[in-house]
Amino acid sequence: MFGMDEAKFERIDHREDVKKLIAKIDTTMGEIELELFHDKAPNAVWNFVNLAEGRQENVKNGPFYDGIIFHRVINGFMIQAGCPHGMGTGGPGYEFDNENDPELSHDTEGVLAMANRGPDTNGSQFYITLAPTPHLDGGYTVFGKVVNGMDVVKSMGTVDVDPYNHKPDTDIMINKVTIIRE
């Protein structure tokens, strides 16, 4: 019988041997290009890749992120997406453990990390920082960084939002996530 860690680990269905992974997120506000740290946070990266490509078992059919909105935007802090309900309350139907590599931190803008509701509750939600946020180190898995399109991320960070839940007044949609292997 599998312990909790093995059961969670098994949920990441597909992995590959690659030198470099790039994710291009095409949004209604422009494109964001991210380098994924598959060697430092393999569970988070392959979960993201498999969801993006529709290979990971989840609550949606097909590519998970296509058509999902950035449901939370806090100017000067971060933008967040990955909830299939568009409210920050949902995920793919499973969770996996945090990966905290001491070499990865929230030390700059453009950090890509898993959003969660507590330790070891990662699923599909992710955020991109708009500024250094070192207070998040150790609690959230950093798994990539913006390499192109930080201007798009910053523009997203300035949209009008509901003051209560920080949901943008006008939806910012993910049209498609494309994964490039090198």
What are these regions (language model features)?
Residues M1-E182:
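Cyclophilin-like peptidyl-prolyl cis-trans isomerases
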